[in-house]
């Protein structure tokens, strides 16, 4: 299974990290978790005018099919265990986007019942400020998430050199 002939003109070499990260960033499947008015702007982002599909971003209704969760709106302390459960059901690797002032910092609701930022419970990768943020802001935030994914280091072990043979695992 090794390379028996020299590389031709139409051959591209790359690292496995780059290839996997390109595939991951080109097919983000977010789980929507709209809790307030930010959810309306999130729905507008998925509509024809902004068309998230052109970026490979397709909303999923099941956490088991999603690799990103967009927390949009006010998170109450009663809702927090549900959000954590949904997050735990998502397969690895997974990313979190906090959309809106309420998800980022609690917004104007400085009360005992509102979580003052979802980052108290989940590791947030991208913050999108605004009340509510415009669809363009969500698009920009998702493109920043794509940039972050493209630069991640994966742990795929050692690389296989050119001309080396792969042996099946025992």
Curated annotation (Swiss-Prot):
Molecular function per GO: 4 iron, 4 sulfur cluster binding; iron ion binding; NADH dehydrogenase (ubiquinone) activity; NADH:ubiquinone reductase (non-electrogenic) activity; quinone binding
Protein name: NADH-quinone oxidoreductase subunit B
Gene symbol of the encoding locus: nuoB
Localisation per UniProt entry: Cell inner membrane
InterPro entries assigned: NADH_UbQ_OxRdtase-like_20kDa, NADH_UQ_OxRdtase_20Kd_su
Role description: NDH-1 shuttles electrons from NADH, via FMN and iron-sulfur (Fe-S) centers, to quinones in the respiratory chain. The immediate electron acceptor for the enzyme in this species is believed to be ubiquinone. Couples the redox reaction to proton translocation (for every two electrons transferred, four hydrogen ions are translocated across the cytoplasmic membrane), and thus conserves the redox energy in a proton gradient.
Membrane topology type: Peripheral membrane protein
Family: Belongs to the complex I 20 kDa subunit family.
Assembly information from the UniProt record: NDH-1 is composed of 14 different subunits. Subunits NuoB, C, D, E, F, and G constitute the peripheral sector of the complex.
Cofactor-binding details, from the entry: Binds 1 [4Fe-4S] cluster.
Catalytic activity field: a quinone + NADH + 5 H(+)(in) = a quinol + NAD(+) + 4 H(+)(out)
Residues reported in the UniProt entry to bind [4Fe-4S] cluster: 37-38, 102, 131
Domain of life: Bacteria
E.C. code: 7.1.1.-
Enzyme kind, highest EC tier: translocase
Native source species: Geobacter sp. (strain M21)
């Amino acid at each position: 299974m090794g390379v028996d002939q020299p590389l031709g003109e139409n051959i591209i070499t790359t690292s496995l990290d780059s290839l996997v990260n390109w595939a991951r960033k080109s097919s983000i499947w977010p789980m929507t978790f709209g809790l307030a008015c930010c959810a309306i702007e999130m729905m507008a982002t998925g509509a024809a005018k902004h068309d998230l599909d052109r970026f490979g971003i397709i909303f999923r209704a099941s956490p088991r099919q999603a690799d990103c969760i967009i927390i949009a709106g006010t998170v109450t302390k009663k809702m927090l265990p549900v959000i954590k459960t949904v997050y735990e059901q998502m397969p690895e690797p997974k990313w979190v986007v906090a959309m809106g002032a309420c998800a980022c910092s609690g917004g104007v609701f400085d009360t005992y019942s509102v979580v003052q930022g979802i980052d108290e419970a989940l590791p947030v990768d991208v913050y999108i400020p605004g009340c509510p943020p415009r669809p363009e802001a969500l698009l920009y935030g998702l493109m920043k998430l794509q940039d972050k994914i493209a630069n991640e280091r994966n742990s795929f072990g050692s690389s296989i050199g050119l001309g080396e043979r792969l042996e099946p695992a025992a």
